[in-house]
């Protein structure tokens, strides 16, 4: 194995450069630390124009807390599948059948404040149908 040092910056530093008049899509995949990062920043309180893609690990005890936090800030949740987006009312991360691991079939979840009509319209244009 080789160790490579990389520089990092706090998530809050990225957020300060966001223009409130533009729309953004932010993908966060920090191996189970999504709740800690999102709840420790002002992203949900200050930005109305940010959609999020978050990975939910099946064994993460913070999944429900993160899901509920985003719902309470006015986001709708959609499970991202090969067939398109499925609206969620609770986290629908599904374990792979007959495999002993933390891997899942679907782990990415799309959170948005856009209307369900607009999400379905975009889904239909990109995928061809709505689930």
Go through the PLM ranges and name each one:
Residues 13-131:
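Conserved acidic-Pro-Pro-aromatic motif
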Residues 1-17:
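S-adenosyl-L-methionine
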């Amino acid at each position: 194995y080789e160790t490579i040092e990389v520089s990092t910056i706090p998530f809050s530093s990225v957020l300060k450069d966001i223009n409130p008049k533009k729309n953004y899509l932010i993908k966060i995949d920090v191996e189970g630390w999504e709740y800690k990062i999102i709840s420790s920043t002002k992203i949900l309180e200050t930005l109305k124009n940010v959609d999020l893609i978050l990975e939910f690990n099946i064994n993460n005890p913070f999944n429900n807390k993160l899901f509920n936090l985003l719902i309470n800030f006015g986001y709708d949740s959609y499970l991202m599948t090969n067939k398109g987006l499925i609206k969620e009312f609770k986290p629908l991360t599904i374990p792979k059948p007959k495999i002993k691991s933390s891997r899942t079939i679907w782990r990415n979840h799309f959170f948005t404040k856009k209307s369900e009509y607009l999400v379905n319209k975009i889904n239909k244009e990109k995928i061809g149908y709505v689930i």
